[in-house]
Amino acid sequence: MQITDVRAIQPAGNNSPPDWRTSLGQILIAIDTDAGITGYGVGGGGLAGQHVVKTVLRDLLLGRNPEQISQLWDEMYQATLAFGRKGIAIMAISGVDLALWDLQGKREQQPVVTLLGGTPGTKMPTYHTVWSTQDLATSGEHAGYKLHLGKVAAPEQRDLMVSSIEQARISIGSAPLLMVDAWMKWDIESTISIAREIKSFQIEWIEEPLSPDDLAGYAILKEQTEVPIAGGEHEFTADAFRPLIEQKLHTVLQPDVNWCGGLTELIKIYTMAKQADLRVCPHRGCEIWALHAIAALDPQPLAETGRPWMTWVKGQPDIQEGMIEVSDRPGFGLLFDEAQLQLVN
């Protein structure tokens, strides 16, 4: 089997994200073969990511054997090394890598979860991300809930955040997990202070309180906070996760399979984390791409759900009673009609 074409588009759906995600949004990559099989993957980088796929990566992949996934990943990384290593180039590679895995599953008539040693139909608990405590009332049944918070600019804002977190715990009761997402907008002092005040609310983790580049800051938090710290959503490649894992700067690692380098790199991250006795909980885990890895590789499966960014993706399993089931269809189990996709201008 040989690759005959590599295509990339940026679809739009009814709930397509606004602002920066419109231009740096998710891109759909299709890899066609002479066997008549097409593999699909989703990466990031918007129009810039498309350009990387359609030029550098397409030139490298045409005529190649799509079954050599690991070798092709290494070659794509080398081909983009001068302008890549993180960000848009790795987001583009992520989508191509996922398309190659989708092809592999379709060729073998197996779901990706089976290729990874897991079982189709595996059910996993979910946690739901909300942007306010008011959203909790309409979030449905889940094993946990994550409250997305903003920047701490003044002491009174800190008090308001602590109060919001307390209200969230009261709202959901004592049984469900409760997480807090700072989205890289806190500082060391605020994180230590807030962590101290919310510890009694049974917080599963504080997510990304600092910039992903502030490893020194995370080292301080590791020593001075008792609430677990999660992060890695905005990190790229297994090599970049290595210091986080070796220094145990995060208790919970959150790679995004559509950004971090694809499934090939996510497998490496899981392997390193297991050796270090650290937990992996992929970002956007309920989306069809990450579910197969979570079902096959995760001893503590927990899948994140939230706003439906990729509404043009069909075949996504439904959440029922707080559980989600991995597909048993070949590949990732993606279903859609290419001719019906809307494109971002």
Label every model-predicted segment.
Residues M1-P11, W20-R21, D34, P282-N345:
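Flexible C-terminal active-site loop/helix
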Residues G41-V42, K146, L178-D181, E204-E208, ...:
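Short catalytic-loop micro-motif centered on adjacent basic/acidic residues
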Residues I3, G36, L57, V96, ...:
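Conserved, mostly hydrophobic/aromatic
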Residues G117-T225:
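Metal-dependent enolase-superfamily TIM-barrel catalytic cores that perform enediolate-based chemistry
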Residues D213-T305:
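Catalytic alpha/beta core domains of metabolic enzymes, predominantly
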Residues D32-R107:
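Metal- or metallocofactor-binding catalytic centers and their adjacent structured scaffolds
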Residues M1-L28, G46-G49, R58, L62-R64, ...:
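Motif-centric detector for short Cys/His coordination patterns
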